[in-house]
Amino acid sequence: CLFGLIEPGDEVVAIEPTYDCYLPILRRAGAIPKLVRVAPPDWKLPLDELAAAFSHKTKLIMINSPMNPASKVFHEEELAFIAGLLEKYDAYAICDEVYEHMVYDGRRHIPLMTLPGMAERCLRIGSAGKTFSMTGWKVGYTTGPAALIGAAAKAHQFLTFTTPPN
């Protein structure tokens, strides 16, 4: 998804700790990572730091919820704050939700794309392998608006041998 949506020099906000391949992919694509860290014991999103990470150069934010490796699940107030920043800066979100069905302790997964105005700004990543506890499958998918899916598919078709062009 990233190679289809960002250009060298674009800023991308990433929330740490993050999945280990995100930062190398961002750097390979020429993006400038803007990192915001959540920390134990409460894993609370520092909203002031998040707001400071956004600028007119921000192209997108990468959200991993439920978060790997921290298992943080973003709550509705945090997602609403992120949505406001996306609208303010005309930015997008790549939402890694591969662990969406692995939420415990009374917490609830809320996809960012379900918030008002976010369906056109979000690409959502899912995983059949994670959903069906077959992690070796490595079968993933994206959902989102046609414009974002099209851009991601054009880049992705040259990275694998099994992806149709459209």
Each language-model region and where it sits:
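Conserved coil-to-alpha-helix start sites within the AMP-binding
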Residues: 18-22
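Short beta->alpha connector loops at strand-helix junctions that form conserved
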Residues: 16, 35-40
